[in-house]
């Protein structure tokens, strides 16, 4: 799916929302004519459909008054079914809150300066302790792109994702899982034997996607959430930005 927002002057990325929804919305009121892109974990689909739609209608009022758009990719704490192209929630938003878009995986957002690839999903490290389809979702992980994806996309400037490739913060893995230096993940892995390998494989998938696209066209930015910390680094002349919870980051 391609989404054209080339008329908006400002581009701002938002870190995980979680419990800071009011703070984030209050910050958004400081901007007009702005395209906001959320890196996920807005808890969409965790509570009832009606609870979500009530919240969206309130945010829609603010966005409409500011002539702004909010695009949301899915995190591991969002229900993946709501981000499908023909989902009931996407249909509701189209008819009742058109300034809010739940972005399907591997959609491309076009702005006046950038082509932005959106990749949702991530593994929950505490999944074995959570309730399926309430606190975590079985298909929460990053999905592989379609076979023809790389043939159709050769001019991506920014990748926005929920998780991060292996080469970006946090640098948890050495070669082939010989060493893993995340205390918190190692703690959960005592009760979840496939956790470390599952995380490794999805971050390796992101790395592979980046490398194939970057070989065709230089990726200027890699922007992501999930890790709840602001860290900036460089890889192959790509600026990698990990966003804090509730952080707004403007890209010129």
PLM region descriptions:
Residues 3-12, 107-118, 155-158, 234-240, ...:
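Beta-strand-turn-beta hairpins that frame and shape the catalytic cleft
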Residues 13-16, 36-41, 69-77, 102-104, ...:
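Active-site neighborhood of phospho(di)ester-bond hydrolases with catalytic His/Asp-centered motifs
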Residues 14, 19-111:
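Core catalytic region of metal-dependent phosphoesterases/phosphodiesterases
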Residues 18-24, 43-47, 73-84, 107-109, ...:
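Active-site environment of divalent metal-dependent phosphoester hydrolases
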Residues 30-31, 59-67, 152-153, 213-217, ...:
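Short, conserved loop/helix-junction motifs that constitute active-site signature segments
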Residues 44, 73-196:
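Conserved catalytic scaffold of divalent metal-dependent phosphoesterases
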Residues 50-60, 140-147, 202-208:
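Well-ordered, non-membrane alpha-helical segments in soluble/globular domains
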Residues 69-73, 95-96, 169, 173-252:
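Conserved beta-sheet core of the metallophosphoesterase superfamily
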């Amino acid at each position: 799916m391609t989404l054209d927002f080339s008329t908006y002057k400002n581009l701002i990325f938002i870190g995980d929302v979680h419990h800071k929804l009011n703070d984030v919305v209050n910050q958004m009121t400081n901007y007009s004519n702005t395209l906001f892109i959320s890196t996920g974990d807005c808890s969409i689909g965790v509570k009832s459909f009606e609870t979500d739609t009530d919240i969206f209608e309130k945010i829609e009022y603010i966005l409409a008054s500011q002539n702004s758009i909010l695009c949301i990719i899915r995190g591991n704490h969002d229900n993946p079914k709501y981000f499908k192209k023909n989902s009931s929630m996407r249909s509701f938003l189209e008819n009742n809150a058109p300034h809010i878009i739940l972005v399907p995986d591997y959609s491309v957002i076009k702005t006046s300066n950038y082509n932005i690839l959106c990749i949702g999903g991530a593994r929950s490290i505490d999944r074995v302790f959570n309730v399926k389809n309430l606190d975590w979702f079985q298909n929460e992980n990053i999905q592989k792109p379609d076979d023809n994806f790389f043939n159709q996309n050769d001019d991506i400037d920014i990748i926005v994702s929920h998780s991060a490739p292996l080469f970006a913060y946090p640098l948890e893995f050495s070669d082939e899982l010989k060493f893993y230096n995340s205390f918190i993940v190692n703690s959960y892995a005592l009760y979840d034997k496939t956790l470390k390998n599952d995380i490794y494989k999805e971050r390796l998938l992101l790395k592979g996607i980046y490398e194939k696209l970057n070989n065709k066209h230089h990726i200027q930015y890699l922007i992501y959430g999930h890790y709840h910390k602001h860290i900036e680094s460089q890889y192959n002349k790509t600026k990698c930005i990990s966003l804090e919870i509730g952080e707004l980051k403007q890209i010129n």
